[in-house]
Amino acid sequence: TNEASRLARQATPLPDTLSTPRQRSLAQARLLMAAAEYADAAQLLKPLASAQPEDLSVRMALADALSRLLDTGDRRAAANEADWLKDRIPPSDVGQQLALLRIWQRIGRMDEARALATRLLDSFPQDSDVLLHAARLERANRNYAQAMVFFRSALMLETRGKDTPPTATLPDSQAQVPVDSDRPLALQQSYTLSVPADPAVVAKIQGEIDAIEARRQPRIEAGHQALSKRSTDGISSLHGWERPVVAWMPRGYDGHYFLHVDRVQLDAGDLPANGPDLLTYGQVAALPPGSPFATERRQRGQGTNLGFGYIGDDIQWDIGTTGVGFPVTNVVGGLSKTGDIGRYSYKLEAYRRPITGSLLSYAGARDPITGQVWGGVVATGAAGRLSTDIGPYSTSLSLSLAALTGKNVATNTRMQLRWALDRDVWRHADGVVNLGVAVSAWRYGKDLSEYSFGHGGYYSPRNYVSVALPLEWSGRRGALTWLARGSVSVSRSSSGESDYFPQSPLLQSLARARPAPDGGVPVYAGSSGSGFGRSFRGALEYQVTPHLALGAQLELDRSAYYAPTNFMVYGRYRFEPGNAPLDNRPRPVQTYSSF
């Protein structure tokens, strides 16, 4: 594409065979389109179309260029060009008719695309190009069973070869080249395949069939994830593991049901025997000094997370429980819908999910003196996400609103807003490098970050803003896939004062009446400040056999007072692997608690 752009813009004369200004301008426009500079190509083609409004090749090239632009006005102009073309392209010109079908599809006029595909199938039922376009159109509309019928018919024709390749009569004796729907129309005026069968074409069709067949493969996944976060022993430290086992059962080609059974073991360590840290845990600060422990000092929990749900192209739902066997067990789940509105993609979600940052927030805990249980926090709310592409950039905006509740924990509210922009800065046959920026803003109604009775043990500043710069490299070589993602960030947060016991005026008054060794009061002081953070996520996956894949993932997060480390090893077994294409990045097993 760089060479095409250079040729289109340099002053070097074009070949003498392009004898007229029209031919030269058209050739330059095609070079610009080959370089993906569609706006410049459209600007060059518009005067040609105005000067020669009946020139079919110019109008087709202009429609092709406009259909690849994201501006709504350009899409409308492309639709106007397509409306003009549909009555003027000869019915027997299969190449141009298929080019028009791709334009309809690109600008979102799916009714016109389907109607044209139906007419072409009626007129050319033995043309593999027509069958392939119809198959891809059905696949785009998620009609996978019908797409398979067309793909298999095209494969049969290509495997035995064509007796007479279709041809198209084009202006200016334009050469015919193979169709590639991802390339500009100017470079693909026909899709004539060789006779006998072309192995590359047969392999491509077979790959598309295999990709659809992969949608209905049963599989099972299992993993072991080690958790580690060093902080105050017995209170905010967290060590342990989660062992997810997930069975995936296909629902035709449309999606998969799944069943999660995840064993979980968490350990915060031993509570301090005395001292200021102990006063900030449970009800200790409200009870007489020296009160004996009613529970063991070791703070830990074992349980099982269970979930059942469905993941399809545009619908996802699940229902389950977290922490069967923990001090607090919660019903969790979610429902989400994705789709497109013009050039925008959206996701709407309602959810109820666990907060897993500490033993207290995830499993709940028992007060060491009274034995009362508190914690086990869940976020119940709704979220929305809107995304689109702007030239080479992808951008998204998301908003999440939730109420946070737990057993004997004060109710809280949370608002999270995030904007992100990224683009691929390097592409190669083996992988891609993506660079971006993300701005996040959070607001909590209360700061319940502490571990005394009524707090939730989860980070909840009143206000938080951060700017992050993520860099990601992912790819595949042979049976090996990889992902490396690093990010640096700066943030600013602030919190107000918070009582030790926001849920209980009685406990708060008892704590105020108890003499404090340092003369202080049972109130957590407010604070504000800035910080610097960095994170890393790396994953490797290897396809050992067509049935079995093994992988590992490491996640690190580092900031002033937060430094968790997670490491996972996992495996995936496909019962009917066939020849499904490999993913271009690892797909680690997801624990149910992280949905």
For each of these PLM feature ranges, what is it?
Residues T1-F595:
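Gram-negative and organellar
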